[in-house]
């Protein structure tokens, strides 16, 4: 089994992800090879909460130009995790 800290890369803090906190949904960038079961187990193990549902999506990188040289930002995988009623992740509190 993979280390849970290798599966969860970093939390996503955007206006949309902050508004999802009201529905008890938390957003993370995760390892692209991780599946929903691994993401669920990682969140439960790291934050000591119960996960009800995991939604994942692959986000394509954008085309960028630096000094007229085209490049691309990396693709990544994003997971929206819904927690059981009453559970919270302290990392996101206070936003």
From Swiss-Prot:
InterPro entries: Nucleotide-bd_a/b_plait_sf (IPR012677), Ribosomal_uL23-like (IPR013025), Ribosomal_uL23/eL15/eS24_sf (IPR012678)
Pfam families: Ribosomal_L23
Cellular compartments per GO CC: ribonucleoprotein complex; ribosome
Keywords of the record: Ribonucleoprotein, Ribosomal protein, RNA-binding, rRNA-binding
The UniProt record lists the keyword rRNA-binding: yes
Biological process (GO), any one: translation
Single annotated GO MF: rRNA binding
Family: Belongs to the universal ribosomal protein uL23 family.
Matching PANTHER family: 60S RIBOSOMAL PROTEIN L23A (PTHR11620)
Description of how the protein assembles with itself and partners: Part of the 50S ribosomal subunit. Contacts protein L29, and trigger factor when it is bound to the ribosome.
Role played: One of the early assembly proteins it binds 23S rRNA. One of the proteins that surrounds the polypeptide exit tunnel on the outside of the ribosome. Forms the main docking site for trigger factor binding to the ribosome.
Designated name of the protein: Large ribosomal subunit protein uL23
Natural source organism: Pelotomaculum thermopropionicum (strain DSM 13744 / JCM 10971 / SI)
Gene designation per UniProt: rplW
């Amino acid at each position: 089994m993979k280390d849970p800290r290798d599966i969860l890369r970093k939390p996503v803090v955007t206006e949309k992800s902050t508004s999802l906190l009201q529905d008890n949904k938390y957003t993370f960038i995760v390892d692209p090879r991780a599946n929903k079961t691994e993401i669920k187990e990682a969140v439960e193990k790291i934050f000591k909460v119960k996960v009800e549902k995991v939604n994942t999506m692959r986000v394509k990188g954008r085309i960028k130009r630096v000094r007229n040289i085209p490049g691309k930002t990396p693709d990544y995988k994003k997971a929206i995790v819904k927690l059981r009623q009453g559970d919270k992740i302290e990392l996101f509190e206070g936003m």
